[in-house]
Amino acid sequence: MAGAWSSDCCEGCSSTNCTCGHKSKWGDSSLLGRRLSEDSSRHQLLQKWASMWSSVSGDASAACPERKRREEAAEPAEEDRPLVFLCSSCRRPLGDSLSWVASQEDTNCILLRCVTCNVSVNEEQILSKRKNENGCILETLYCTGCSLNLGYLYRCTPKDLDYKRDLFCLSVGAIESYVLGSSERQIVSEDKELFNLESRVEIEKSLKQMEDVLKALQTKLWEVESKLSFTSCKS
């Protein structure tokens, strides 16, 4: 894949914000927030991503005043920040929620319009064996760093599944998420580092050593001065 990001056409995609004008049964963002199975960790993770994305991709009329309030706030709420999807094995970034199209609850996958260059595509095409995907031709997606199987790219689909064509289907089990801007740790420069008990003890120890050295030098200086004065008196 060329460049830092690879982008594919979302022809027939189901995103409610897509400019192509096509919609499908599951395109409504409200469907992304449906309650999923509580006993499945993958379903819970998918639900979390879907609900976070739904909170920032609602109707434009309702989003305008909320967007104004977010712009005025110094720190955006965590649920309003974009998600970065990482390889679960080597933690390389694979994509983000800004290219989100939809989630597939039955297959535990998310559909993205584009991914990063860390996702490689095996151009060997295979027929999908998934339920209700008869006639779909797929290309396998791998992580360029660790070769982990990430999912599939839909290259050819029957008419009723056209919304999946040229979309990247990433398996929830192969990826992890990171909320952009959620890190709290800051690097403190050496000149601004706060004193603690250990550093105070070390400083006091160094000062004591310097004091001992100065006293020794002062004693040597007195000895030299005494010898010089004694020599001058004899002469």
UniProtKB/Swiss-Prot annotation:
Modified residues (Phosphoserine): 37, 40-41, 235
Chief subcellular location: nucleus
GO CC field: CENP-A recruiting complex; chromatin; chromosome, centromeric region; cytosol; nucleoplasm; nucleus
Binding, Zn(2+): 87, 90, 143, 146
Keywords, in A-Z order: Cell cycle, Cell division, Centromere, Chromosome, Isopeptide bond, Metal-binding, Mitosis, Nucleus, Phosphoprotein, Ubl conjugation, Zinc
Entry similarity comment: Belongs to the mis18 family.
Record's protein name: Protein Mis18-alpha
Gene, per the UniProt record: MIS18A
